[in-house]
Amino acid sequence: MSAQVVTSLLILAFVACGVLYDALLSPQGRLLHSQAFRWRRLQNWFPMGVAYAAFYMARYNVAAGNVSAVREKLGFTSAYMGWVLSAGSWAYAISGPFTGQITDRIGGKRGMLIACLGAAVCNLLLGVLFLCNTPGVIQQIFFIVLYAANVLVQGFGTSAVVKINAAWYAPSERGLFAGVFNIMLTSGYFLALGTGSSIIGSLGWPYVFVIPGAVLFEMALVISRYVKNSPSDTHNFTNKQLVLISPPQQPADALKGSSKDGSKDKASSSADNQTEDEGEKIRLTPKQQMKELMRNYTFLGYLVAVFFLCWARDGFLNWFLSFFDAVRESPLTASDTAIIGGAWTVGGFVGGILCGWLSDVIFHSDRVMPIFIFSLLQAFMLGLIYFVSATCSVAMLGGLIFLSSVFLLGNYTLLSYTVPSDLPRDIAAGASGIMTAVGYFSTGLSGAIMGGIIDGAGYSVWALSLMAASVLAGVFTKLGSYFSAKRPKHHAVIAPVPPKIEERTPLAPDSSDN
């Protein structure tokens, strides 16, 4: 069997294990729900997981074709491809808060349908654009506009997935489900990076857009038929079956863990509640909330950490195939890219689980130290990849990509959970939207700058910036934690107080957001 088939089967095995665990083996799921409910819930989230994997394919298809052979055939420079990638990231960053608010009004299912149909139309139009051999300048303008629109409408899907899954899962179930759903999301990396070269070689460049566009259109039909906003919309379960008997968990408890003595926790909780009752509560408007966030050094530290982490992650992800193509004696084959794309995908599976396990078991629920260590390790791995990629075997290169993915994606997953636990609750609710916007702004900035740098100075500055950004992400996470330990008590609350803190990112359905 070819490397692409073997890798595809391995990823399908991960997906199957996640599906079976959620439907049959999850202890909390078995405790709270009937088997019929769990299977109906699977029928609800699995189509959204497939659609979100297709979103990733429709987002990173440009990165799959960002190699010299494809660029030269299209007449594109590295700098121009960088601007295409930046347009998509900036569109997502600017629109993120608005798509979330709109989805809250129209409902999760409608938001998901808008995302699927909108991204499908944009990708199919991109396919037509390149199939018709449109004149150069017009083609370049429409490429940027349609790709930006494609990524923008995907923001509706991010909010919709969070909203719908939160209605089907009790707080005590969401942590493990986040890992299961993350397997579905991360498989989209392979659909784009692992199969992109094969699609371009056998069908042509336009079909890296046509295929995800067609898949998303089909998934819109499936979602319209099977997905429901909440269990009560199915009309198949009684009120007794819909009751979630797990008590709501406080975000800090869910994220930090509970490793201390129970009586001590109760005493601490009682003292905090008494302080809240005695203190004067100030209700903050959205404008005042933003000011509080911008004055909070813990938040600013984590915000800068997210900026540098996204610079390293997407700066590497969008250009590593181009780098390998430039420094190796012979271009990567479709089998080679399948190995590399599969290594990145499986590394993402392992990274989120490993980093979380280390923080809980080894570091006793301390999230900051694993992030700091992983940041240093990812800097080392990125430097090693730069120095050995020209001469090492494809198998060794796949191993290095796997390790870099473990550290990069593990870091990203854990950092997205750290913020709500270390910030005061009165300003935590607004933090995640700002962090998502800053992360995608960083991604766009790296695309705009990297393309020009690579055209002018080669890949040495590219690699150096990734290593420096990795180290700085760890440093600023440490600084944010330091200021968190120093901060005084806060008594202000947001008006109105939200029932739960949601983080709108696909990597964190629990907070629920990426």
What are these regions (language model features)?
Residues S8-F14, Y207-R225, A463-G480:
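Symmetry-related core transmembrane helices of the 12-TM Major Facilitator Superfamily/SLC fold
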Residues R59-V67, N296-I353, Y412, S416, ...:
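Extracytoplasmic gate region of multi-pass secondary transporters
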Residues R105-C116, V361-S375:
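Cytoplasmic membrane-interface "Motif A"-like loop-to-helix N-cap segments
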